[in-house]
């Protein structure tokens, strides 16, 4: 008797393959009757390595090519689900697609990585004019507020490529800012010099979580994903994505968040910050909601916080950022 198969898609980078294999293992452990196969594809974001993400607006850079295969006419090539770093998923998906689930989140913080042998242990140790490598305007904008004496330069490439650039004695960087989760998943946690908590930097929407994208209304796959979803991660990430969607920001716009959910009290706390590119203006606020309906109340929390922040001037900052991006293009 032929075993039924589930085709899992993801990007080709080493980190993406680790993440896709992790989801495959989660599904296989719960549903041993299925054959789970991982397929990898190159996306537009993988192909364009010479321009900063900020100049693209960040929407669908990592998802479009994979989405096409969810509706592929060739059944052998057709994907049943796609594994994304949730922070790379647009908050508004095209018709015919939906976020099927969020798996358990890994450390959502950003971190500082110093070159091997560096005497410096934190950002505050770095001398004036030291160059910090980051591909994210959210990161550089927030750090400019706290460390205006440092310089910030775009760095692209996968984790190993960035670390090679950092460790090169002839390279320009005195440190890198990376997502802690990526290093943890790649077995490189020992490279983390300093974790950046919210007193220094709010993390990206969905950072550290995996989002599983599926065909809209695919009941069979939804039932499978229900078994590997994580409640706390789902609640927090739905709220974070709702905040970003309401503020109309793409994944490279400087919106930072921090969220927590208490299972006993059902209280969800969402904090958010919007910073201009120069790091000279910031709107920061928070919202608490009791979650009775997981989807409805989590989304409501993000909407309420967004409206607070818009009232305080966040929209003005975001409009200026979007105008600057159009001029650069």
Curated annotation (Swiss-Prot):
Pathway field of the UniProt record reads: Porphyrin-containing compound metabolism; protoporphyrin-IX biosynthesis; coproporphyrinogen-III from 5-aminolevulinate: step 2/4
Q: Which GO terms describe its molecular function?
A: hydroxymethylbilane synthase activity
The record lists the catalysed reaction(s) as: 4 porphobilinogen + H2O = hydroxymethylbilane + 4 NH4(+)
Q: Which GO terms describe its cellular component?
A: cytoplasm
Arranged from A to Z, the UniProt key words for this protein are:
Heme biosynthesis, Porphyrin biosynthesis, Transferase
Q: Does the keyword Magnesium apply?
A: no
Top EC category: transferase
Q: Which InterPro entries match?
A: HemC (IPR000860), Porphobilin_deaminase_cofac_BS (IPR022419), Porphobilin_deaminase_N (IPR022417), Porphobilinogen_deaminase_C (IPR022418), Porphobilinogen_deaminase_C_sf (IPR036803)
Record note on cofactor = Binds 1 dipyrromethane group covalently.
EC number(s) stated in the UniProt entry for this protein: 2.5.1.61
Gene Ontology biological-process annotations: protoporphyrinogen IX biosynthetic process
Q: Which residues carry this modification: S-(dipyrrolylmethanemethyl)cysteine?
A: 251
Keyword Nuclease among UniProt keywords? no
Q: Where are the transmembrane segments?
A: none
Tell me the superkingdom of the source: Eukaryota
Q: Which cofactor does it need?
A: dipyrromethane
Family membership: Belongs to the HMBS family.
Another remark in the UniProt entry says:
The porphobilinogen subunits are added to the dipyrromethan group.
Q: What does this protein do?
A: Tetrapolymerization of the monopyrrole PBG into the hydroxymethylbilane pre-uroporphyrinogen in several discrete steps.
State the protein's name: Porphobilinogen deaminase
Q: What organism, scientifically named, is this protein from?
A: Candida glabrata (strain ATCC 2001 / BCRC 20586 / JCM 3761 / NBRC 0622 / NRRL Y-65 / CBS 138)
Q: What gene does the UniProt entry assign to this protein?
A: HEM3
